[in-house]
Amino acid sequence: KGLYSSFNSMNMFEINHSLLRQFGPENWTLYKGKHLLCFVDNHDVTRVASILTNENHLPLIYALLFGMPGIPCVYYGSEWGAKADKSQGDPALRPSFKEPEFNELSEFISKLADIKKNSKALNYGDFTSTVLTNKQCVFRRSTGDETVYVAINADDQEYTAYFGAEKNQVTDLLSGAIINLDGGLKMAPYSAYFLA
């Protein structure tokens, strides 16, 4: 619930609080070092494409899912934005699809999965929040030899994030773009970045 609720209420503090409580840098956190299954929807709840109030947030919620600690799970059909409400009953939530519908969302999730699969930091790294506003969050996932910053802008306006990265020039793993951080990270409206 914290994932979609943070986007619907434009309150990134909600999901950040949960992630810090579960995986933060303190020794008392609940699941530090654990690899929990994480999802935005499943066979028993309203599909995330139906529950988000702004469709521009759909790719962003998956970016957050694949960037945060845990093992991301994508419920079949949700990778292309299938919709269904829990009030419609189980058959609506668990349909038989004739064939997959490849689209921008499924391509984006495929990129996220590839990035996650190939990143030690995203699979085993610690979690540190570096920038947090109601509509933006940047967090660091880091192991001894790799660091990835995950940056989300859920707003319809550009935002510049300053977060003290270890190096001034980074690569966005999603786009392949080389980004100079001297003036901060200029985040486009409704955007996500995985910076290494």
What do these predicted ranges mean?
Residues 1-2, 87-98, 175-176:
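Short glycine/proline- and charge-enriched loop/turn segments
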Residues 1-88, 127, 134, 141-143, ...:
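Conserved alpha/beta catalytic core and glycan-binding cleft of carbohydrate-active enzymes
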Residues 24, 93-130:
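Aromatic- and carboxylate-lined catalytic core of secreted/periplasmic carbohydrate-active enzymes
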Residues 131-135, 181-183:
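Ser/Thr- and Asn-enriched, surface-exposed coil loops between beta-strands
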Residues 139-144, 195-196:
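Active-site beta-strand termini and strand-to-loop segments that position acidic
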Residues 157-175:
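Beta-strand-rich binding/interaction modules
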Residues 171-185:
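Solvent-exposed beta-strand/loop surfaces of large extracellular or lumenal domains
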Residues 181-196:
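C-terminal beta-strand-rich structural cap/linker in extracellular carbohydrate-active enzymes
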